[in-house]
Each structure stands twice: as structure tokens, then as C-alpha cells.
């Protein structure tokens, strides 16, 4: 079953190898799909042991597994703790919704890193070409302190962003990629 799903995924994503036919890739916020989009990877790792999964993937001549997790979790400024006024319904609903999601996100990121670490520990003992796993975790909260960090953490969830917010997020992405050691290791592995 897992092998059939892998073949289906491979066929579905093959067209993205043609940059002229499909020059753009639009991604969906993982929180909208399955909490960071990592759930399917983690489900797969729970169904098969690392040993079985490694053996299956060796059949496809893979050399690297690279997962780039972009955690765009915001931190909207609110000042409810600065006033004796009872918080409004919007503040209460945001708290009730965001706290459990934030905790699940944190747990998923930790589990994903643990999976990559376990995978790489297993492959150290393998002979020949190895399949290395890289888990690149980029979080807006890891930006250096300053106006850009404050601005991007206060961008609300939306299906449309004004160009000024897009520009700030691109600048933030560049900084996060530049400061990520794991990203640079993964990039080097692809060369």
C-alpha cells in the first residue's frame, strides 16, 4: 500500500520537474491541511520501521530526504494583559483556537526533528551510498529582533496578502535561510 502511494505521489509530482511548463509552485499553509503538512511524513514513519522505510526508499535511488518546514505562526500583538477590561470575543476566540494549534505545531516540529535524527543515526551504520535526511526548520520567531520580526509576526492569516507584506516575508525568508545551518548542509548535499 505504501509503495503504491509513493508511486502515485511520484507520478503526480513529475510534472513539476519541468520549469518551463510549470515555472511556479504555490504552496498551501500547512496549518490549513494537516498541521504543518508534516503529518503524512510522520504517519509513514509510524507505519514502517526506519529499517523498512530505508529499504523501500533505496529502491528509488534516493540520496537525500529534505524537509523544509516553514513555521509562519504569527504572534499578533494584543494588549489584553495590560488592561482590567474584559477581553472581547475576538481575543477570546483567537486564544481558544491558537493555543492548542501552537502546542500541536511545537510537538510536530519536535517529532519531525527526532525522526530525522533517528534516520541519520540508522544510516551511519549502513554500507555504501546512504540516504541522508535533513529537517530544515524555519520559523518567523527565529528572526533577529527588530522591526521586520515585529512586522511579520503581526501579519494575520489570510488568503490574500498585500504586496508590502509579501516583500517583508520574502526578506524574512532570505534571512532565515541564510542563518539556517541545516539548510546550508542540505544545499551542499544537492550540489
Model-predicted regions and their roles:
Residues 1-7:
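Soluble non-transmembrane domains of integral membrane proteins
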